[in-house]
UniProtKB/Swiss-Prot annotation:
Record note on what altering residue 306 to G does: Decreases cinnamate binding affinity and reduces catalytic efficiency 3-fold
Organism: Helianthus tuberosus
Gene: CYP73A1
EC number: 1.14.14.91
InterPro entries (UniProt xref): Cyt_P450 (IPR001128), Cyt_P450_CS (IPR017972), Cyt_P450_E_grp-I (IPR002401), Cyt_P450_sf (IPR036396)
Record note on what altering residue 371 to F does: Reduces catalytic activity 1111-fold and cinnamate binding affinity 15-fold
Name under which the protein is recorded: Trans-cinnamate 4-monooxygenase
């Protein structure tokens, strides 16, 4: 950084300190704010709590300050909610007031400042985008149209693992093959396309760019420059890299998928009775003037991240827990063999008749919640919550992981025990009917992908357990399940090697 930039930063820092002191005095008189650590001018609580605002660190703060707390992160107010009652207020009772989204400097780049659906502010644009995306992606008709493809992709995973001699001996990193499966599941829906193998050059390019996008967006490393604008010059290279990755991804989506589908549509007109893939519906909305070309591309951006990665993380967590709990794996296999018959492959309609499989999926989503803080909410205007004033444009985090892992609310929550969803928690569902358990959120800004994720999880985990005995690699009694948290993500730190011994029927 050159000398002039350093001088400008120091001058801005001095001016901001004076301004922050004056503003804090004025605001202190106006608001009854939630409890939290005492902030200092400019930096707020950043020097005390740091950049790593993962679900476990926020849980520790909630134990100190209560079910609602306020962190002043530089110029941003961050409100953390850690009780079912307050979660209901944010997500349901005051769903309109807290229904907007806050973005940071990196997500502004990757979403075109909210031209997508997931990160746009609450209002007419969000309602329009939600409506346009619901029909081609998030209905039972879509499930019935594409479930045969999901079953075929799961069968292909089983076949490929069986063909790999290393799988039954030293083991393989099965996640790599499951990643291809998830891309094919979603690209069938989006573009009526699939990739033939893990070595497909286009798949490799897409996977690499999506992976880099996730790494950059989910990192805590850039928080300081987002929280404290006067430090943003230090992020210049980071933000430049984000823009480069974003531009490459958007261009790839356009050149290889959206424009290709446009060509098919222009040469082969489809009537309303023919099955269309999702992008056909979205392009129709563009032709009607409801959305623009950028909106189309950012919808594709959302699906590449939200639908593919989160479901893949959950599959990986579920397999890891079954490997580390062989008695649960055996019990699940017994249910599949008994109810379907040995060797009879599970299909989507079977999932609803397999209560223990459903319990395994629910327990995976409880203990290893892929989005443990949900996607952040925001109130556009001053609001009230839990008897406290919440200043306008506060970032609201619901610690959904703690709601589902609080020992005051759950029996031995640290244990992976699917039986809880057949016994004391038998009435709890993943759709948000109980505010202690919100793996997909609830209300206006809940994740609509639940309708796709649950059957894909059931089919995939079911097929693997039916066809293989899943074990740790030789010399290990368990596989590593250390976590890696992100801005609001939770996935397994190390992609484990797993032995998959084929069963004989």
């Amino acid at each position: 950084m050159d000398l002039l930039l350093i001088e400008k930063t120091l001058v801005a820092l001095f001016a901001a300190i004076i301004g922050a002191i004056l503003i804090s005095k004025l605001r202190g008189k106006k608001f009854k704010l939630p409890p939290g650590p005492i902030p200092v001018p400019i930096f707020g609580n950043w020097l005390q709590v740091g950049d790593d605002l993962n679900h476990r660190n926020l849980t520790d703060l909630a134990k100190r300050f209560g079910e609602i707390l306020l962190l002043r992160m530089g110029q941003r107010n961050l409100v953390v909610v850690s009780s079912p009652e307050l979660a209901k207020e944010v997500l349901h009772t005051q769903g309109v007031e807290f229904g907007s989204r806050t973005r940071n400097v990196v997500f502004d780049i990757f979403t075109g400042k909210g031209q997508d659906m997931v990160f746009t502010v609450y209002g007419e644009h969000w309602r329009k985008m939600r409506r346009i995306m619901t029909v081609p992606f998030f209905t039972n008709k879509v499930v019935q149209q594409y479930r045969y493809g999901w079953e075929a992709e799961a069968a292909a995973v089983v076949d490929d693992v069986k063909k790999n001699p290393a799988a039954a001996t030293e083991g393989i990193v099965i996640r790599r093959r499951l990643q291809l499966m998830m891309y094919n599941n979603m690209f069938r829906i989006m573009f009526d396309r699939r990739f033939e193998s893990e070595d497909d050059p286009l798949f490799l390019k897409l996977k690499a760019l999506n992976g880099e996008r996730s790494r950059l967006a989910q990192s805590f490393e850039y928080n300081y420059g987002d929280f404290i604008p006067i430090l943003r010059p230090f992020l210049r290279n980071y933000l430049k890299l984000c823009k480069e990755v974003k531009d490459k991804r958007i261009q790839l989506f356009k050149d290889y998928f959206v424009d290709e589908r446009k060509k098919i549509g222009s040469t082969k007109k489809m009537d309303n009775n023919q099955l269309k893939c999702a992008i056909d519906h979205i392009l129709e909305a563009k032709e009607k003037g409801e959305i623009n070309e950028d909106n189309v591309l950012y919808i594709v951006e959302n699906i590449n991240v939200a639908a593919i990665e989160t479901t893949l993380w959950s599959i990986e967590w579920g397999i890891a827990e079954l490997v580390n709990h062989p008695e649960i794996q055996a019990k699940l296999r017994h249910e599949l063999d008994t109810k379907l018959g040995p060797g009879v492959q599970i299909t989507e309609p079977d999932v609803q008749n397999l209560p223990y499989l459903q319990a395994v999926v629910k327990e995976t989503l409880r203990l290893r919640m892929a989005i443990p803080l949900l996607v952040p909410h925001m109130n556009l205007h001053d609001a009230k919550l839990g008897g406290f004033d919440i200043p306008a444009e506060s970032k609201i985090l619901v610690n959904a992981w703690w709601l589902a892992n609080n020992p005051d609310q759950w029996k031995k929550p640290e244990e992976f025990r699917p039986e809880r969803f057949l016994e004391e928690e038998a009435k709890v569902e993943a759709n948000g009917n109980d505010f202690r358990y919100l793996p997909f959120g609830v209300g206006r800004r809940s994740c609509p992908g639940i309708i796709l994720a649950l059957p894909i999880l059931g089919i995939t985990i079911g097929r693997l357990v039916q066809n293989f005995e899943l074990l740790p690699p030789p010399g290990q009694s368990k596989i590593d399940t250390d976590e890696k948290g992100g801005q609001f993500s939770l996935h397994i730190l190390k992609h484990s090697t797993i032995v998959a011994k084929p069963r004989s029927f």
